From Swiss-Prot:
InterPro entries: C-N_Hydrolase, C-N_Hydrolase_sf, Nitrilase/CN_hydratase_CS, Nitrilases_CHs
CDD domains membership: nitrilases_CHs
Family the UniProt entry places it in: Belongs to the carbon-nitrogen hydrolase superfamily. Nitrilase family.
UniProt GO molecular function: aliphatic nitrilase activity
Domain called CN hydrolase: residue spans: 8-282
Name of this chain's protein: Aliphatic nitrilase
Species this chain originates from: Rhodococcus rhodochrous
Reaction catalyzed: an aliphatic nitrile + 2 H2O = a carboxylate + NH4(+)
Length: 366
């Protein structure tokens, strides 16, 4: 049963990473986690791929030039799920008794993913969800998620969900999230300063509109967290004035938004680092849903509905003959999650996965 009576405090981070340095950015992340906990928060949220930072170089140079300069370093500083860096994040959540949603560049074998880690206050990994479809030139760096990455998680304080960046432009993805009665949503973004003012769709106003609309459409609280572009970013990514103009400056728009669309905390300047704090009262959701509940009384499923495949999929299913096999297949460290081992014609056993059984559901119709 979904409850709407809890009250608690949340934190939204607006900050830049230590560019493409996983260890130092984890240090900064742990420090921010501690600060949010000292201020009485039950949840702190971090930007998209905060560790080790958003790859702005893909937007300001040719793919070949960007790869030559940054690809190896970015790959090396992306996090594997069994890395000491991830363990430090889990430990920080446990030590400070606070839930954490943090964006990382996840390395799985040779591929990278735009991942959000959902960690509870006991330091347990609740979810590792990947961006379903990286945006535009992001697809030259990152792979895709799957249906199991669209989910909402029961936390002690609320039903919690998270999406990255332009996933907030994906109408069907949003509707699937709303259908799971999400109460608090983490919207993780990079700093949106690219190509301004020539391309308004990439600017702060457009992204903030999408973020605020998420709160209004879903009648949910939104904790919006962003990176910022500072002179340090220019120094790191840019070789000339033209590239500095393309990346721009600032781009921060962290917010904490209520289900009626109002800001619950005073925003920072677009180029300022800091943490926003706000108190959440879930009963405000019930007031908003009295007017419009798009997955309840304000829906018409007989006219419009969504097919939602939440199954976790993998590119390889391995069959092993029990008659002719001379050794047992053992999944190697870092192997694909959910690769299946088939012993005989009728037996199928899933290898260990970070996903729960719940995320392996068959296609659902909403």
């Amino acid at each position: 049963m979904v409850e709407y009576t809890n009250t608690f405090k949340v934190a939204a981070v607006q900050a830049q990473p230590v560019w493409f340095d996983a260890a130092k950015t984890v240090d900064k992340t742990v420090s921010i986690i501690a600060e949010a906990a000292r201020n009485g928060c039950e949840l702190v949220a971090f930007p998209e791929v905060f560790i080790p930072g958003y790859p702005y170089h893909i937007w300001v140079d040719s793919p070949l030039a960007g790869m030559a300069k940054f690809a190896v370093r970015y790959h090396e500083n992306s996090l594997t799920m069994d890395s000491p860096h991830v363990q430090r994040l889990l430990d920080a959540a446990r030590d400070h008794n606070i839930a954490v949603v943090v964006g990382i560049s996840e390395r799985d074998g040779g591929s990278l993913y735009m991942t959000q880690l959902v960690i509870d206050a006991d330091g347990q990994l609740v979810a590792r969800r990947r961006k379903l479809k990286p945006t535009h030139v992001e697809r030259s760096v990152y792979g895709e998620g799957n249906g199991s990455d669209i989910s909402v998680y029961d936390m002690p304080f609320a039903r919690l969900g998270a999406l990255n960046c332009w996933e907030h432009f994906q109408t069907l993805t949003k509707y699937a999230m709303y259908s799971m009665h999400e109460q608090v949503h983490v919207a993780s973004w990079p700093g949106m300063s690219l190509y301004q003012p020539e391309v308004p769709a990439f600017g702060v106003d457009a992204q903030l509109t999408a973020t605020r609309m998420y709160a209004l459409e879903g009648q949910t609280f939104v904790v919006c967290t962003t990176q910022v572009v500072t002179p340090e970013a220019h120094e790191f990514f840019c070789d000339n004035d033209e590239q500095r103009k393309l990346i721009g400056r600032g781009g921060g728009f962290a917010r904490i938004i209520g289900p009626d669309g109002r800001d619950l905390a005073t925003p920072l300047a677009e180029d300022e680092e800091g943490i926003l704090y706000a108190d959440i009262d879930l009963s405000a959701i019930t007031l908003a849903k009295q007017a419009a509940d798009p997955v309840g009384h304000y829906s018409r499923p007989d006219v419009l509905s969504l097919n939602f495949n939440q199954r976790h999929t993998t590119p390889v299913n391995t069959a092993i003959s029990t008659i002719h096999a001379t050794h047992t297949l053992v999944p190697q460290s870092g192997a694909l999650d959910g690769v299946r081992e088939l012993n005989g014609a009728d037996e199928q056993r899933a290898l260990p996965s970070t996903h729960s059984d719940e995320t392996d559901r068959a296609t659902a119709s909403i």
